[in-house]
Amino acid sequence: MLILSRKVNEGIVIDDNIHIKVISIDRGSVRLGFEAPESTLILRAELKEAIVSENQKASVCVDESLLENIKKVIKP
């Protein structure tokens, strides 16, 4: 992990097309501004974690024996 110190109005550039700028620092909260191509997905970490969690809940693990029983019922 790269750790950088930045002051208000300072920023960093990632891969020539993603610009991150420190907008403000107030009471332990940092506001960041992002400029990136529209095709770049930018999410807060907690939102990304929630999406991953919901996707895991939505995925279904099917028992192999159940599939075999279905194959017996549906004969070509």
From Swiss-Prot:
It holds the Pfam family CsrA. Keywords: Bacterial flagellum biogenesis, Cytoplasm, Repressor, RNA-binding, Translation regulation. InterPro entries: CsrA, CsrA_sf. Homodimer; the beta-strands of each monomer intercalate to form a hydrophobic core, while the alpha-helices form wings that extend away from the core. One of its GO terms (cellular component) is cytosol. It is found in: Cytoplasm. It comes from the Bacteria. Belongs to the CsrA/RsmA family. GO terms for biological process: bacterial-type flagellum organization; mRNA catabolic process; negative regulation of translational initiation; regulation of bacterial-type flagellum assembly; regulation of carbohydrate metabolic process. One of its GO terms (molecular function) is mRNA 5'-UTR binding. A translational regulator that binds mRNA to regulate translation initiation and/or mRNA stability. Usually binds in the 5'-UTR at or near the Shine-Dalgarno sequence preventing ribosome-binding, thus repressing translation. Its main target seems to be the major flagellin gene, while its function is anatagonized by FliW. This is Translational regulator CsrA. Its main location: cytoplasm. SUPFAM superfamilies: CsrA-like (SSF117130).
